[in-house]
From Swiss-Prot:
Binds 1 heme c group covalently per subunit. It comes from Cereibacter sphaeroides. Residues 1-22 form the signal peptide. The main subunits of complex b-c1 are: cytochrome b, cytochrome c1 and the Rieske protein. Heme c binds at residues 58, 61-62, 207. Component of the ubiquinol-cytochrome c reductase complex (complex III or cytochrome b-c1 complex), which is a respiratory chain that generates an electrochemical potential coupled to ATP synthesis. c1 functions as an electron donor to cytochrome c. GO terms for cellular component: plasma membrane. This is Cytochrome c1. GO terms for molecular function: electron transfer activity; heme binding; metal ion binding.
Length: 285
């Protein structure tokens, strides 16, 4: 019975995985971010650059309504000086909940909502999107590489080729742009097989390519290529979704070290308490 259930489950998994592979999932790059792994940390300068890209490019459409502006000065993040955070907040206009009047933003306010109704909020985007899925539709890859949210964002931002797939020539959806990583957009019928399954990676997205080389000018003179800016803003959005990530890692490391020391002490104590008993031989009365 157990063997039959196992075979049935394996068959279902293979079929669902095969369907997912045949559907032409989006292509996601594996980016070696500094914060990955148990000992990884956010790069403060990268987060500051990512904030600049978000402010000058992404914020025109996308909001981050769950992120308080004051968190920009907190440890583990961009760590901007408090005077810079206050100055940064003033560029936003918010509606005071008590008076109902518009006023300049304060560090205690949150980032604004998305400017467009159909523009996704980016507060939790790095946690809401999965870039890695593993073979045959399983989550094995996520066990080793993580969910891959930042990689997904990076891949979408850099996934606009100069030419669309040949199957779409002359049949591209109006007002949409082909993206190798975006999976849930529209696909012309010419890029589908007889069963209606798309035959190309990615799909068409309403967002035009948001980045181009040297679109922003970094104060530290860092490279401002499309790939560099995409990596910076992806890291920043990961921090926005997980602002306490470094603190959690530190707490986890401390807990592991404490439990390790405690285990050693308990082992030595147990050995000492039972040393006199375990060393004696039983005698027949």
């Amino acid at each position: 019975m157990i063997r039959k259930l196992t075979l049935t489950a394996a068959t279902a998994l293979a079929l669902s995985g095969g369907a997912a592979m045949a559907a032409g999932g989006g292509h996601v790059e594996d980016v070696p971010f500094s914060f990955e792994g148990p000992f990884g940390t956010f790069d403060q300068h990268q987060l500051q650059r990512g904030l600049q890209v978000y402010t000058e490019v992404c914020a025109a459409c996308h909001g981050m309504k769950f992120v308080p502006i004051r968190s920009l000065s907190e440890p583990g993040g961009p760590e901007l000086p408090e005077d810079q955070v206050r100055a940064y907040a003033t560029q936003f206009t918010v509606t005071d909940e008590e008076t109902g009047e518009d006023r300049e933003g304060k560090p205690t306010d949150h980032f604004p909502h998305s400017a467009l109704e159909n523009a996704a909020d980016l507060s939790l985007m790095a946690k809401a999107r999965a870039g890695f899925h593993g073979p045959m539709g399983t989550g094995i890859s996520q066990l080793f590489n993580g969910i891959g949210g930042p990689e997904y964002i990076y891949s979408v931002l850099t996934g606009f080729p100069e030419e669309p797939p040949k199957c779409a020539e002359g049949h591209e959806p109006d007002g949409f742009y082909y993206n190798r990583a975006f999976q849930n957009g529209s696909v012309p019928d010419t890029c589908k097989d007889a069963n209606g399954v798309k035959t190309t990676a990615g799909s068409w997205i309403a967002m035009p390519p948001p980045l181009m080389d040297d679109l922003v000018e970094y104060a530290d003179g860092h490279d401002a290529s499309v790939h560099a800016m995409a990596e910076d803003v992806s890291a920043f959005l990961m921090w926005a979704a997980e602002p306490k990530l470094m603190a959690r890692k530190q707490a986890g490391f401390t807990a592991v070290m404490f439990l390790t020391v405690l285990s050693v002490l308990l082992y030595l104590t147990n050995k000492r308490l039972w040393a006199g008993v375990k060393g004696k031989k039983k005698t027949n009365v």
